[in-house]
């Protein structure tokens, strides 16, 4: 591995080391109890492995996922990318940055979680976002480049102190959702959806590919290998942090009365665990410092997402100006952020339960076609069937329409019913492709 590989690896790490995602591992650790290891490893699979795989697969075509998804279907490519940008933008990810910032700063410092306090905070937060995005400058990037190492140092200090403070404690008791190693795995797997990093990787993979090209690597195979090695570096670093935070959360003593109180006050348990770690480890100053760093890091993330989503929509629908998109997406994010962190997370679950299976299936199909060439129909069949099953399963799970056959699907009780279907339909797709003579084989464009 050369110097550039390490640089790109830590660039990848910085992209996925989001302040907003730090709340999930401790919460999973607390809830998983004796099933911690299968839960956290499954979380790492969807929260780290899939995002990095997504970036690596994005390097297969010179146009990134725009080119790769177009091979499946141009209409599917546009619709799916729009859904992804809305998901990682104004519908869920951007509002979550604001509500997380609120619960990491105002709630522990002012000891309030009121709707009025949240409203005032989000007004100020999104006015700053609006100003910085309408008048984009390098300032946000510079602040972000300073905050990432500062946040990393703070988290590492918390981890070391957390092991000292909680490492000798017995593990927590698993909640009702965790009844076996396999249920722990499935819970961790679907909890990893909440990071939204795998679908973000589809949107931003070209940033990494261009960073690799900037080092002088231009051959397609070398770009793929360089991105793969950089991805391994980022994965190891992220796994250490997520597993460590999860392990500490797994050994924190939180009474049922406290959990009931947090739930009654609509306060997120993950943010409570993080602020408690900081407070116990470093006192009031540590709690305040962590909150401020996380809030600023979330702010820079929000700015980056608003700019990226606005630029994307302006590119595909140019009649509306970039600034109008910024205003629209900032306003939507402001409205949704005022529902509170738990509500934002809850609202995202049905959408992510549809988007993630489609995204995972698409990424794996693109990767498979790289090594086992085929025709578009081989990808179209599994993507279409997985999309239909995921939508119907979500409708059934939410109780909107009862579809009894959904419960009989393999792995439905673990929210993985789409996976065997993806495997079977991929095999069928390849068989059909071998019989179809009119379609040309998929060829990913290289430099």
Curated annotation (Swiss-Prot):
Keywords from the UniProt entry: Amino-acid transport, Cell membrane, Membrane, Transmembrane, Transmembrane helix, Transport
InterPro entries associated with the record: Brnchd-chn_aa_trnsp_Livcs (IPR004685)
Pfam families from the UniProt entry: Branch_AA_trans
Disulfide topology: none
Domain of life where this protein originates: Bacteria
Role according to the record: Component of the transport system for branched-chain amino acids (leucine, isoleucine and valine), which is coupled to a proton motive force.
Protein name: Putative branched-chain amino acid carrier protein SSP1343
């Amino acid at each position: 591995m050369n110097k550039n590989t390490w640089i790109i690896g830590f660039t990848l790490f910085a992209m996925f080391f989001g302040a907003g995602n730090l709340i999930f591992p401790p919460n999973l650790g607390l809830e998983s109890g004796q099933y911690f290891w299968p839960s956290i490893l499954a979380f790492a699979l969807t929260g780290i492995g899939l995002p990095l795989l997504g970036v690596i697969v994005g390097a297969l075509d010179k146009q990134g996922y725009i080119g790769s998804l177009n091979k499946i279907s141009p209409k599917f490519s546009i619709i799916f990318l729009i859904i992804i940008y809305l998901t990682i933008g104004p519908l869920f990810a951007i509002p979550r940055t604001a509500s997380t910032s609120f619960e990491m700063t105002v709630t522990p410092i002012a000891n309030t979680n009121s709707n009025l306090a949240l409203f005032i905070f989000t007004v100020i937060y999104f006015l700053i976002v609006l100003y910085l995005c309408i008048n984009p400058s390098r300032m946000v990037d510079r602040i972000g480049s300073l905050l990432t190492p500062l946040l990393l140092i703070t988290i590492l200090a918390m981890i070391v102190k957390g092991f000292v403070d909680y490492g000798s404690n017995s593990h927590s008791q698993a909640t009702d959702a965790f009844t076996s190693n396999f249920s722990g795995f499935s819970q961790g797997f679907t909890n990893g959806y909440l990071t939204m990093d795998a679908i973000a990787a589809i949107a931003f993979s070209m940033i990494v590919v261009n960073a690799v090209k900037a080092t002088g690597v231009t051959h397609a195979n070398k770009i793929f290998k360089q991105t793969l090695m950089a991805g391994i570096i980022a994965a190891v670093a992220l796994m250490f942090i997520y597993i460590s935070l999860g392990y500490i959360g797994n050994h924190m003593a939180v009474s049922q009365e406290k959990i009931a109180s947090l739930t009654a006050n609509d306060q997120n348990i993950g943010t409570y665990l993080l602020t408690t770690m900081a407070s116990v480890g470093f006192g009031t100053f540590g709690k305040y410092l962590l909150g401020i760093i996380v809030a600023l890091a979330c702010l820079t993330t929000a700015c980056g997402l608003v700019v990226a989503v606005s630029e994307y929509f302006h590119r595909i629908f140019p009649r509306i100006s970039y600034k109008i998109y910024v205003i629209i997406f900032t306003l939507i994010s402001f409205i949704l952020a005022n529902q509170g962190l738990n509500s934002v997370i809850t609202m995202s679950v049905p959408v992510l339960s549809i988007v993630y299976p489609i995204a995972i299936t698409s990424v794996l199909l693109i990767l498979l076609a790289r090594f086992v060439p085929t025709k578009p129909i081989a990808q179209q069949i599994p993507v279409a069937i997985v999309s239909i099953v995921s939508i119907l399963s979500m409708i059934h799970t939410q109780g909107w329409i009862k579809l009894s056959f959904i419960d009989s699907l393999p792995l439905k009780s673990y929210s993985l019913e789409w996976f065997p279907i993806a495997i079977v339909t991929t095999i069928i797709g390849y068989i059909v492709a071998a019989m179809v003579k009119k379609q040309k084989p998929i060829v990913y464009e290289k430099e």
